[in-house]
Amino acid sequence: MPFYKQPWVFSKVFVLAMAKPPSFGCCFFLLFFSFLSSSFVSFALTDTEAAFIVQRQLLTLPDNGELPDDIEYEVDLKATFANTRLKRAYIALQAWKKAIFSDPFNTTGNWHGPHVCGYTGVVCAPALDDSDVTVVAGVDLNGADIAGHLPAELGLMTDVAMFHLNSNRFCGIIPKSFEKLKLMHEFDVSNNRFVGPFPNVVLSWPDVKYFDLRFNDFEGQVPPELFKKELDAIFLNDNRFTSVIPESLGESPASVVTFANNKFTGCIPKSIGNMKNLNEIVFMDNDLGGCFPSEIGKLSNVTVFDASKNSFIGRLPTSFVGLTSVEEIDISGNKLTGLVPHNICQLPNLVNLTYSYNYFSGQGGSCVPGGSRKEIALDDTRNCLASRPEQRSAQECAVVINRPVDCSKDKCAGGSSTPSKPSPVHKPTPVPTTPVHKPTPVPTTPVQKPSPVPTTPVQKPSPVPTTPVHEPSPVLATPVDKPSPVPSRPVQKPQPPKESPQPDDPYDQSPVTKRRSPPPAPVNSPPPPVYSPPPPPPPVHSPPPPVHSPPPPPVYSPPPPPPPVHSPPPPVFSPPPPVYSPPPPVHSPPPPVHSPPPPAPVHSPPPPVHSPPPPPPVYSPPPPVFSPPPSQSPPVVYSPPPRPPKINSPPVQSPPPAPVEKKETPPAHAPAPSDDEFIIPPFIGHQYASPPPPMFAGY
């Protein structure tokens, strides 16, 4: 069992001496009672007890855990002390003793009387500002298994430079009064049950070097200012932090930083390359993603680099060869592709390289387990290496390998944005070009259509209403045909996860879910064809300028009755229909821009006035164009009129639906590959043990 989850067991021996053997019922009762008593002592602090302690702390804490300046004068003490600082320490320690709920080893049993320097776990030393004055310089209660909370009175011990409480059962928050401990040098509250936001009191300590919050329940964001402190060790692992890793990480002079087992998101900051003193960096088991920044290769002093169980994508940067001091590299449990470079496995000090549970399709000769570097522990299982055993299936590999990631466009690796968004933008551009070519073969019909319309716009109202009357019929047919393929897409999307056998992946596939957003970029190509009908209409909207004259007359009001029948499906299938309904009116300005091309072919309009015959075939294409506006424009006009102004950025509207659909499809992939047969133990290989009491000048 991991050391941080050990139940603190304490045995008890019950001796039952009785003159007469008890009856079986009485014996059973006594044995049962003794079992309950011993089991109660053996278990760690329950949630109910923890809640009770937290409630006690909240009832005793002043506002925000701050202390009034005259608190020491509010305590009537009959004992005498060598100096005022020891008196203040006595007040603080007595308040702390009252806040203790359980002390199984009786560690604080001798916390009585004014001689605080004799208390167990209390360290005294000459004051830094006056060597003739003895003060409480530190508290060391590591491993005492004490349950309780921290009272605000602890802020009275302003000479404390060392505060070690690891491996206890303290609950509640870190009081704000700790800001007064300006001499704090080492602060270790790891392996307890503290809660609340990040304890910002650390930001007020000018000389703190060691900061350890491991194995607690702190949550929220980590302030960027933390990495601007002159800290040598920063332990944040195994909490509930959810923020991104600040870019200020590169300003930290720390030699050890751990982010493991939280919920950090975003990228590894590119500033990491500025951490010249860094020896160990652990990102394991978070929600980090994107490509690895090439700046990692500047960490020439790093011995441990662990980025396992995240959502990193793309190829390994060639700059990794700059990790000349590295001994252990763990990048398993991601979505990395490409090759494992030969020169990475040739690093002089490398002892362990784990790149299992990725999608690598090739590896250098020295990276093959049992190859030329037999002294190195290598793990390449569950990749896409054709010649190696225990690899992923071809179908499983195709899901990721067929969607390569260009890290030069990835924001985490220095690109302007992720490749997923630009790709849909580029895809629509060719789509409108194709409709432009389509009008060219039939320029005569659209040209003939506008020619009569402009010549007699007022005279045509009568035929115009007739055409809309004919249009609803095809309109009703076309929308029905278009929703059918739309649902077919979602139906087809769930199939791949069923086909892809990923149930044996022991790693949390949530990273895979998160990272499928970039790969969809190439997949977004299918959606554009689905939405391509809307793009072609815009060129067709070049005629609509005259058609806009019909919209003003409420001739199109008849269509609304049928559309309501079809309006439910669009919202059911996807929001794009309502999104595209505004675009036609919004795109109406662009058509005038595109209308210049029609005017060029407008030279042909005058000749054939027999446009009425062609319009029927031409009306068949327009129905898709006109049907959406009449069918959906009423809903948009009546229900959300303000939406059109918000959607004044139509060009971007086409891409958003695609990413949205892709983000929904990945969850389909995510649930499939879930399996917990193989459990990765927590990272305990490199323990930064709490240092002994400080041996610096004055203490």
Swiss-Prot record:
Residues 1-39 form the signal peptide. Hydroxylated on proline residues in the S-P-P-P-P repeat. Residues 411-699 are annotated as: Disordered. Residues 421-466, 482-504, 518-659, 690-699 have a biased composition (Pro residues). The keyword Iron-sulfur does not apply. It comes from the Eukaryota. Glycans are attached at N106, N301, N352. It is found in: Secreted, Cell wall. Residues 517-699 are annotated as: Contains the Ser-Pro(4) repeats. One of its GO terms (molecular function) is structural constituent of cell wall. LRR repeats lie at residues 133-157, 158-180, 182-205, 206-229, 231-251, 253-275, 276-299, 301-323, 324-347. InterPro entries: Leu-rich_rpt, LRR_dom_sf, LRR_extensin-like_regulator. Pfam families: LRR_1. Keywords: Cell wall, Cell wall biogenesis/degradation, Glycoprotein, Hydroxylation, Leucine-rich repeat, Repeat, Secreted, Signal. GO terms for cellular component: extracellular region. GO terms for biological process: cell wall organization; pollen tube growth. Expressed in flowers, stamen, pollen, and pollinated carpels. Its main location: secreted. Modulates cell morphogenesis by regulating cell wall formation and assembly, and/or growth polarization. This is Pollen-specific leucine-rich repeat extensin-like protein 4. It comes from Arabidopsis thaliana. The lineage of its organism: Eukaryota, Viridiplantae, Streptophyta, Embryophyta, Tracheophyta.
